[in-house]
Design a protein with these regions (language model features):
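Glycine-rich phosphate/adenosyl-contacting loop at the front of the ribokinase-like
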Residues: 1-67, 74-85, 110
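Short, well-ordered alpha-helix to beta-strand connector turns
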Residues: 2, 137-138, 171, 203
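Conserved phosphate-binding/catalytic loop of the ribokinase/pfkB sugar-kinase fold
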Residues: 91, 95, 105-157
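Short, flexible loop segments at the rims of nucleotide/cofactor-binding pockets, characterized by
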Residues: 42-44, 118-123, 150-153, 181-186, ...
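Conserved phosphate/ATP/ADP-binding segment of small-molecule kinases
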Residues: 161, 168-173, 179-248
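Hydrophobic beta-strand scaffold residues
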Residues: 64, 90, 174-175
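Short beta-strands and strand-loop turn motifs
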Residues: 116, 140-148, 173-182, 210
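A glycine-rich helix N-cap at a beta->alpha junction
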Residues: 82-98
């Protein structure tokens, strides 16, 4: 019998306009007020931890159940239709009071991606949306992205702590993934060092990116890395000894 996996949390519709070929050094070379840019097709697919990790594991042969929330709107229909193509929409919740989350992904050649993101129904996702009867049968519970889910970072992450603790008590291994934080949003004002300090005792596998972790634990270092990258990808300018090890 296959060991079961639960992937829960953030799901959205990703809309990625395809830019013309040719790397540039700054966003301003491409995007400026009043300018018209002739684009390629738009790549439309599911995004977020639930779809990205869940469907990948399913395609690799794992017995996966997805748990996420969408609105009763056109984007929600599109997400569920895509998941249905993988026989994976069971466990998804439709909330008539919420709108479906989406991201417009600006992937300009030579520039780190820019995300225009609407969290939508993800903001209201809570422990009560988890089917614990299924969790009790699972060997692994993977959750992401609390950084884009207001219910999970409010009150110093009380709901996130409650979730991961409750899941770990069922005997399942727990895994937590993050996403980038908008510094000007409520998530950007949250005390992430405190939230992580309260949550990680109930997490077996923690898989943030260096940018996400640096933003949360050392904002000055994060801003320094952004300056050093000069509009490019931060990972291109990282030093293992000076930048990565101090965060470990």
């Amino acid at each position: 019998m296959k060991k079961k996996v639960i992937v829960a949390g953030h799901i959205c519709l990703d809309i990625t306009p395809v830019f013309p070929d040719g790397k540039v050094k700054s966003v301003e070379q491409v995007l400026s007020p009043g300018k018209l840019i002739q684009m390629g097709n738009a790549d439309v697919h599911t995004g977020g931890a639930v779809a990205n990790t869940g469907l990948a594991m399913k395609l690799l042969g794992a017995d996966v159940s997805l748990m996420g929330k969408v609105g009763e709107d056109a984007f929600g229909d599109m997400i569920l239709n895509i998941l249905d193509g993988y026989d994976a929409k069971e466990g998804m919740i439709r909330d008539k009071e919420s709108t479906t989350s989406y991201s417009v992904v600006l992937a300009i050649p030579g520039i780190d991606r820019i995300f225009l993101h609407h969290p939508g129904a993800n903001h209201t996702f809570a422990v009560s949306d988890i089917d614990f009867d299924k969790v009790k049968e699972a060997a692994l519970f993977h959750f992401g992205y609390p950084t884009l889910m207001e219910s999970m970072y409010n009150n110093d992450g009380a709901e996130l702590v409650h979730l991961m603790k409750s899941v770990q008590e069922t005997g399942a291994a727990t895994s937590l993934d993050l996403a980038a934080v908008d510094a000007n949003s409520k998530a950007g004002q949250a005390d992430w060092a405190k939230i992580l300090g309260r949550t990680l005792p109930y997490v077996d596998f923690f898989v943030p990116s260096i940018e996400e972790l640096c933003f949360m634990l050392d904002r000055d270092k994060f801003e320094e890395l952004q300056v050093r990258a000069d509009g490019g990808d931060i990972t291109d300018v990282l030093d293992i000894e000076q930048d990565v090890k101090p965060l470990a």
